[in-house]
């Protein structure tokens, strides 16, 4: 997979930022010590963060994948173990977690100071994705769309299977482009973790689950 990434033309034009800065451990019934969600091993021997790295490395080489963590994470031996395998200079430490937008901004400042012209893909670290090959295919298509028009800001949405109240939703507007594999819509707005009645309305009106995967340049 690593060799495939090196041969992909996106390897030189796209950097990834993985958001793993959640500050608080998650209460769960797993035998391992309580950890922030990205570092938990839900299935098998790899954590959600380790699965995220492996997934992205199908498209982008490891040295172009940056991971945002919180400083307090570094006091945990298991978290340090997981981070220790990353290439030098690719772990970004924020002094204090300030939620998603400041974390993205800090990471962008770090990456852009080194690669001013690069495209950037933002990935959550705590998503379990069953159909990983399809997911990476759509990330690749979105990256190609960015290369065709660098003014675009792209965010991946998924057609909901049911009205989930713990997810964020994208409200798509007009269809702007379509290929045999993917449709592009303008975004009308977002709905964050709605009540069930609102979630049902959003799904019926064509709302999409928000993967929180974003690709942009400017």
What residues fall within each predicted segment?
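A secondary-structure boundary/capping signal
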Residues: 124-125, 217
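Conserved core of the sugar-phosphate nucleotidyltransferase
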Residues: 132-218
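Conserved N-terminal catalytic core of the sugar/cofactor nucleotidyltransferase
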Residues: 1-36, 41-124, 130, 134-136, ...
């Amino acid at each position: 997979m690593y060799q495939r990434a090196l041969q992909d033309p996106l390897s030189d034009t796209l950097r990834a930022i993985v958001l793993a800065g959640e500050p608080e451990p998650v209460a769960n019934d797993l035998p391992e010590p309580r950890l922030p969600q990205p570092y938990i091993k839900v299935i098998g021997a790899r954590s959600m963060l380790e699965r995220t790295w492996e997934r992205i490395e199908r498209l982008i080489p490891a040295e172009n994948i940056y991971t945002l963590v919180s400083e307090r994470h570094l006091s945990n031996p298991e978290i340090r173990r997981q981070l220790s395998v990353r290439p030098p200079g690719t772990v970004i430490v924020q002094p204090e977690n300030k939620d998603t937008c400041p974390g993205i901004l800090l990471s962008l400042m770090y990456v852009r100071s080194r690669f001013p012209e690069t495209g950037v893909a933002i990935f959550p670290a705590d998503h379990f994705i069953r159909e990983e090959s399809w997911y990476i295919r759509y990330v690749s298509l979105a990256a190609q769309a960015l290369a065709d028009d660098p003014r675009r800001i792209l965010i991946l949405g998924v057609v909901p299977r049911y009205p989930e109240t713990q997810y964020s939703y994208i409200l798509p507007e007009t269809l702007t482009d379509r290929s045999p594999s993917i449709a592009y819509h303008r975004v009308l707005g977002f709905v964050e973790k709605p009540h069930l009645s609102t979630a049902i309305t959003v799904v019926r009106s064509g709302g999409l689950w928000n993967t929180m995967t974003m690709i942009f340049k400017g």
